[in-house]
């Protein structure tokens, strides 16, 4: 396949990574027996509606609940209510759903079970502001964080301390019921407190940590948000809190699982897979330059492995926005990679977000080929100018190389594959 059509193989690798994280493949084995009391289902994230549907299909007892997902990501459920809200910048629909979810958690008993279906995107989908913070404040802070270059862990630390539901608060509200967390990880390192900002797990970080991040990236906090952090009133639920004693957490799908699934497809095609890491962070364009150097070392010297091979990686890079183009971290990475490769023969690549959305575009990512730069120049497009303007989507769309999947109904972060023949 690699000799005939590298593009087909790269798309097959991406599809395998996404398929490995589909809820129907990873939820059933984690389900317990029904409890003596009620079963309440709550959740948030881009994959959470699909998770709810699978849970309904495999749950033998009664259940009810509420799950919030991104617009366009709802799927039909019979017993669990699905609500759609905005992502990545939150809206009133998400705020209302978060408030209702917190209310549903009240009054549960020790014989009840709460199943929490949490996946990436839940931070924006549960925007219940803390004391003195408005939804408009949270929207402004979220926009600033997204443009700042902060890591996802840093962004979520700030979000947790400005929230009335994140940072373990939702789990604390469920006490004394038993809480079962089923998490699909979209964050480097798979730390549960960073997945959807950890609404149902303890948080060891502090308001002081959040303030330090705000200062580091020069985020202009509204007065109410600053007061909440400086006073310590935004403190989260800490490890050892007795209200979380009945919480059990399982990571049911992770970026590493997705990479391993793609590696199997590569081996079947006669290509050696090299897994470089499932939690790579850093500026997207810098990561692109480093990956290009590794690919060129393989091509020129057969190190660390000989071609044909494919370099696989995951994680979540960042983009410090300086231009006004249509960008996203995956297309920023890929454009920087293409520029650094400078048309090197025999090297093709794909980069995409496994949820189908890179940045603010309904586009998962893109593909790059050895003639990417020459085709751009032929159309009057200057690749370095596009990179400087953070216009990765505009660049690859003009070449017909966008990767468009639609809603994938899962999310295990970014997927990158560099095929060297």
Q: Language model features by range: what are they?
A:
Residues 1-42, 50-51:
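An N-terminal, well-structured beta->alpha segment
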Residues 68-110, 158-159:
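Glycine-rich oxoanion-binding loops at beta->alpha junctions
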Residues 177-180, 202-292:
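Accessory alpha-helical/coil subdomains and C-terminal extensions
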